[in-house]
Amino acid sequence: MENFKHLPEPFRIRVIEPVKRTTRAYREEAIIKSGMNPFLLDSEDVFIDLLTDSGTGAVTQSMQAAMMRGDEAYSGSRSYYALAESVKNIFGYQYTIPTHQGRGAEQIYIPVLIKKREQEKGLDRSKMVAFSNYFFDTTQGHSQINGCTVRNVYIKEAFDTGVRYDFKGNFDLEGLERGIEEVGPNNVPYIVATITSNSAGGQPVSLANLKAMYSIAKKYDIPVVMDSARFAENAYFIKQREAEYKDWTIEQITRETYKYADMLAMSAKKDAMVPMGGLLCMKDDSFFDVYTECRTLCVVQEGFPTYGGLEGGAMERLAVGLYDGMNLDWLAYRIAQVQYLVDGLEEIDVVCQQAGGHAAFVDAGKLLPHIPADQFPAQALACELYKVAGIRAVEIGSFLLGRDPKTGKQLPCPAELLRLTIPRATYTQTHMDFIIEAFKHVKENAANIKGLTFTYEPKVLRHFTAKLKEV
């Protein structure tokens, strides 16, 4: 098997969900009704759903079996302690708060860290800035809701789809330290390390880069939060690309990675493979005060701290999923599936970001050069792909990035990308071939695809619920 060209799916399919086929006319009507926003399509009208890998994949038999052990006690559930034990064993973090998903963790820790910086360091809320290699959209949104400006400090290779680089998700370390000095260290409430960097194309961050980032953070006494949705994929890339760790296990690399943060926030719906769940964890007693404050907010916003909006069975499933998501054979297959899709698209001259961990990212700016950024070329491409083949994908570009909350002007985006997100253990190689063929048809009509403008624009996280029309 070692020398075969393609890895088959390393699992057997036991339960299937039928999907319906629709006509072009049906899909054209559906996308117009949705306001040219694939988020607002009904799932039953989607043939292949590449909107997200968040909670949309299959679960393992061990995860499904674990649900039967669920303790549904309101407080002190043994299922909570099973989850907390998994966190200690995998990440080395002592304090665990479950949440319903990643944004549940964000809405808790962000105001707590801002308040802590204000009380201990005299943070000026009118000047505060948080830094990241690239903020995930909800992390950015929660920061802005709390009055915190966000700044992404990424390397120059990150968004250049013509460049191949092992760790495109890395922090620009000089830019990070320069930015901290500019705003004043006391006005930086937190640094977020996003692994992998979703907005850059599911690109990994090296351990060397994380170490250096953490050293800078410690120099200025700034807390570091690891945004951990795709921690296992990041560990796999480190094993493959960072020579020092080629003989380490995924578990060993993961444990080493989390030495270089103080807290973790996780949407467990990605690499932990669960349909619902999140985590907020603190490494040790130095953040016990933060843990205490976050537990209090959890009661108000998520639920009692030993369930955090999750039923007992869901916590048991997550406790197992954290391990199952680190399986080396599984990760090798998953990364290879994404690479297969990217290779197939590039063979038909569809320019992509180099293959990342969870999705193929098409360079819509190059495919549709006639559509300006403020008419959202990747969103227009998403709508066309749905019309042609019933495939739902998601824009990662100017539409998602949004406006400057202070000036109201569109923020400049480094690339206009269309994300084709692969749900875990859900689609086969035949589906990948169908997606590639769909892009052949899209390319034939590319010159006739029109840009988009708003008919309804929310002020925060607009890409989820906005409505548009063709220009």
UniProtKB/Swiss-Prot annotation:
Enzyme Commission number: 4.1.99.1
Matches recorded under SUPFAM superfamilies: PLP-dependent transferases
Positions of post-translational N6-acetyllysine modification: 5, 115, 156, 450
UniProt keyword annotation of Lyase present: yes
MF terms in GO: tryptophanase activity
NCBIfam families found in the cross-reference section: PRK13238.1, tnaA_trp_ase
Reaction catalysis annotation: L-tryptophan + H2O = indole + pyruvate + NH4(+)
Cofactor(s) the protein needs: pyridoxal 5'-phosphate
Listed name of the protein: Tryptophanase
InterPro entries per the UniProt record, alphabetical: ArAA_b-elim_lyase/Thr_aldolase, Beta-eliminating_lyase, PyrdxlP-dep_Trfase, PyrdxlP-dep_Trfase_major, PyrdxlP-dep_Trfase_small, TNase, Tryptophanase_CS
Alphabetic keyword roster: Acetylation, Lyase, Pyridoxal phosphate, Tryptophan catabolism
Species of origin: Escherichia coli O9:H4 (strain HS)
Subunit structure and binding partners: Homotetramer.
Pfam families tied to this protein: Beta_elim_lyase (PF01212)
Pathway field: Amino-acid degradation; L-tryptophan degradation via pyruvate pathway; indole and pyruvate from L-tryptophan: step 1/1
Family: Belongs to the beta-eliminating lyase family.
Modified residues (N6-(pyridoxal phosphate)lysine): 270
